[in-house]
Amino acid sequence: MPLVSVCMTTYNHEAYISQAIESVLAQHTDFGVEIVIGEDCSTDSTLEICRQYEQQYPDVVRVVTSPQNVGMHANYRRTIEACRGEYIAMLDGDDYFSDSNKLQMQVGAIEEAGAAMCYTRSERKSQTKITIYPQGKLHDSFADMLILNTAENCTTLARRDMILRYYD
């Protein structure tokens, strides 16, 4: 049983999905990690790329799909429900982890603090690699984080039970 599940939702991300998956496979951890990909009936070659990774890494990569597109919200829900890890890290098919120690550091931080979730600063870039949003400032309080809403989805790691309780 993996300690961390990476919940990766995707739709028409053929240009990005390999980088997203490879960034998880490159993680240095002392625990098990699985990648659960919610593929929402892409019209490009995203599903084929995901299936190739599933065949190459059958103990790590699982693809969740359906005969018809279910939309972003339902795709997240079914992918989260398919995750088996105690923790879930979010990563969409057009994002990637830039630090190969990300998951190890975040699990350590959550376990040391006894927290339910954590997130990191991030930098958002355009398709041409131009920085749109530079790394955000550190927040002084939980209220700041909620009001400023700068916790990017792809930086979040949370306890699975908390996500299932609150994600609707």
Labelled PLM ranges:
Residues 1-168:
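Nucleotide-sugar donor-binding/catalytic module of glycosyltransferases
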